[in-house]
Amino acid sequence: IVGGSTTTIASYPEITALLYFNRQACGGTILNNRSVLTAAHCPFGDAASSWSFRVGSTNANSGGTVHSLSTFIIHPSYNRWTLDNDIAIMRTASNINFINNAVRPGSIAGANYNLADNQVVWAAGWGTTSPGGSLARFPGVNARHVQIWTVNQATCRTRYASIGHTVTDNMLCSGWLDVGGRDQCQGDSGGPLYHNGVVVGVVSRYTAWIQSNA
């Protein structure tokens, strides 16, 4: 998370730190006691055994409970080139135990959820805290969050097209339009985007365009 501030798991008990060979790599949202929602590009092409996730901890590297995976399900229409339908569900090998103010399932927006332009949304995760920085150099060990805003779809599509990226109707754009300095970054992929406490999006991609445009 770039441009945000530290937070605690008590504020976001639905979020999970996804670990690739025991190192924080992506984020996720608890769906129920056996499933976690994330971005398809996180585990795509990997063995389930190479991933695990930590719940119930503000720190990505310690505390809470670590669960291994039994399998993961990539959205059948996921496109690795355009990142359309960039969502996946991870199945745990053991039940997730819900704990008040630390571990609970997220509230997921339904198909008819109405989200207008310029609405306040919040992103949370353990990604790098420096634009262009790597997780190794700028790890987000403690959970962070940032307030951003939804961006008009047509505006988003036009601006991304100028740098050769496709924005489909399945995508939601958010950021700080024409100001920048706040957003999700490397390592936040798969984590939630909240609108009034409801998960309305899964972090899919971050580009340098955000620094000057979003």
Swiss-Prot record:
The keyword Hydrolase applies. Keywords: Disulfide bond, Fibrinolytic toxin, Hemostasis impairing toxin, Hydrolase, Protease, Secreted, Serine protease, Toxin. It comes from Lonomia achelous (Giant silkworm moth). Belongs to the peptidase S1 family. Sensitive to serine proteinase inhibitors and thiol proteinase inhibitors. Disulfide bonds join C26-C42, C156-C173. The keyword Disulfide bond applies. Residues 1-214 form the Peptidase S1 domain. GO terms for molecular function: serine-type endopeptidase activity; toxin activity. Hemolymph and saliva of the larval form (caterpillar). Transmembrane segments: none annotated. Pfam families: Trypsin (PF00089). One of its GO terms (cellular component) is extracellular region. It is found in: Secreted, Extracellular space. Fibrinolytic activity; shows preferential cleavage of Arg-Gly bonds in all three fibrinogen chains. Contact with the caterpillars causes severe bleeding, due the anticoagulant effect of the protein. The lineage of its organism: Eukaryota, Metazoa, Ecdysozoa, Arthropoda, Hexapoda. InterPro entries: Peptidase_S1, Peptidase_S1_PA, Peptidase_S1_PA_chymotrypsin, Peptidase_S1A, Trypsin_dom, TRYPSIN_HIS, TRYPSIN_SER. GO terms for biological process: proteolysis. The active site is at H41 (charge relay system), D86 (charge relay system), S189 (charge relay system). Its EC number is 3.4.21.-. This is Achelase-2.
